[in-house]
Regions:
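Histidine-centered divalent metal-coordination motifs
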Residues: 98-100
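Conserved beta-strand-loop surface patch within small alpha/beta domains used
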Residues: 1-93, 102-134
Length: 134
C-alpha cells in the first residue's frame, strides 16, 4: 500500500492492486493512448484520510487518444453500485483517474474543470474529491 500525505494534511492510501492497474496503463510508448476510469474508496471515519481500493479501467465505450481520455458513463454507475453494496455502504465514488503522456504529469485546464464540476454537482458523497494522474 502506498501512503500519500497531501499538502493540506489529507492522507490517501492506495492499495497495491490499484497501483498495479495504474502502472499497467502508464503511457511509455509514443503510440500509447490515454487511459482512465473512476476511483472507488472510503473515508476513514471522522478523519481526513481516504483509502483508494478499486478503479475502473477503460472500456470500449470510452474515447481514447494520445492526448485525451473521455470516460463513458455507461459502465461507471453499475460499478459504483456494486462496490457500495459489497462494502455495506462504506465505499463509493471518490473521483477520477487517467494517464498523461509525460514523465511528471500535471493537471490540465480540462482536468481542473472536471474536478470543479464533480465538486459542484456533488457526484461524490465525500468531503474531498480525488484526481489521480498517472
Amino acid at each position: 500500500m502506498l501512503k500519500i500525505s497531501l499538502s493540506d494534511g489529507t492522507i490517501v492510501d492506495i492499495e497495491n492492486s490499484v497501483l498495479s492497474i495504474f502502472q499497467s496503463y502508464e503511457q511509455r510508448q509514443l503510440w500509447a493512448k490515454e487511459a482512465g476510469g473512476i476511483l472507488i474508496g472510503k473515508q476513514v471515519e471522522n478523519e481526513d484520510h481516504y483509502v483508494l481500493s478499486a478503479v475502473t479501467t477503460p472500456t470500449k465505450h470510452d474515447k481514447r487518444t494520445r492526448f485525451s481520455f473521455t470516460r463513458s458513463i455507461l459502465s461507471a454507475q453499475p460499478f459504483i453500485n456494486k462496490k457500495w453494496q459489497e462494502s455495506n455502504g462504506t465505499e463509493n465514488y471518490l473521483g477520477e483517474w487517467h494517464t498523461h503522456p509525460e514523465a511528471n504529469p500535471i493537471p490540465s485546464d480540462t482536468d481542473k474543470a472536471l474536478i470543479r464540476q464533480i465538486v459542484s454537482d456533488k457526484s461524490s458523497p465525500f468531503p474531498k474529491v480525488l484526481l489521480v494522474i498517472v
